[in-house]
Amino acid sequence: MAEWKTKRTYDEILYETYNGIAKITINRPEVHNAFTPKTVAEMIDAFADARDDQNVGVIVLAGAGDKAFCSGGDQKVRGHGGYVGDDQIPRLNVLDLQRLIRVIPKPVVAMVSGYAIGGGHVLHIVCDLTIAADNAIFGQTGPKVGSFDAGYGSGYLARIVGHKKAREIWYLCRQYNAQEALDMGLVNTVVPLEQLEEETIKWCEEMLEKSPTALRFLKAAFNADTDGLAGIQQFAGDATLLYYTTDEAKEGRDSFKEKRKPDFGQFPRFP
């Protein structure tokens, strides 16, 4: 078993690391890991830290226990206009979390056991990969409880499973077992519950062996197809970052600092 080390301490999540892998766990098993604005704020903080940590190459998102990955927003704190935290301001800050997961230039893996329902289902959708236990259950509940996700939860879901299936998932609010999810391309693999973490770590370790720059650009390219100009901006930012590491870019910088004309003729013009 992996020996996870606590990276930071939070009230409603766990944030741990192990051999280049960060694991962020929603720690509210008593409510099937439903999230509050505080839960989401803590996840955003942990994801941002994992993004900035150069020792972390892959991030895992999980739920405490084996009964639920995440059951979505905690309906007990849902108020007028959003979910209400200690500051009494209604929020839908999970949208910020979804976007953060998409733009982090590292693979994010959903490790799903039990229920991935509602907003929890959308969280696994926006992750790059999903490893599911054989007890996993997937589905949307929005139209049953007066809610919906008209962003990644529907549009990107349709890219994954097709428009007809995505409409079925949302219009009927049925639940699907792990094998059904695998058959529709909603998850990457299904393993026995007792092997879930072991298999997830195996996938993470395989990715850690790959070029981090290649993975960064591949993620940006995959997302650019669905994220419009914001996706292109992310891809362009990654390209600029890579360009800054070249001798050609350094020549432009240094010539400005040295108040001389840059010598770009020394660099090849590839076809």
Swiss-Prot record:
GO molecular function, one term: bicarbonate binding
Superkingdom to which the source organism belongs: Bacteria
Cofactor(s) listed in the protein's UniProt record: hydrogencarbonate
Disulfides per UniProt: none
Keyword Mitochondrion: no
Binding site for hydrogencarbonate: Q140, T141, G142
Key words, A-Z: Lyase, Menaquinone biosynthesis
Chain positions of site Important for catalysis: Y83, Y244
Listed pathway(s): Quinol/quinone metabolism; 1,4-dihydroxy-2-naphthoate biosynthesis; 1,4-dihydroxy-2-naphthoate from chorismate: step 6/7; Quinol/quinone metabolism; menaquinone biosynthesis
GO CC, any one term: cytosol
Gene Ontology biological-process annotations: menaquinone biosynthetic process
Sites where the protein binds substrate: 71-75, 83, 115-119, 141, 147, 244, 259
Biased composition (Basic and acidic residues): 250-263
Reaction catalysed by this enzyme: 2-succinylbenzoyl-CoA + H(+) = 1,4-dihydroxy-2-naphthoyl-CoA + H2O
EC numbers for this chain: 4.1.3.36
NCBIfam families hit by this protein: menB (TIGR01929), PRK07396.1 (NF005637)
Homology family: Belongs to the enoyl-CoA hydratase/isomerase family. MenB subfamily.
Chain's role: Converts o-succinylbenzoyl-CoA (OSB-CoA) to 1,4-dihydroxy-2-naphthoyl-CoA (DHNA-CoA).
Protein name, entry field: 1,4-dihydroxy-2-naphthoyl-CoA synthase
Organism: Bacillus subtilis (strain 168)
Gene: menB
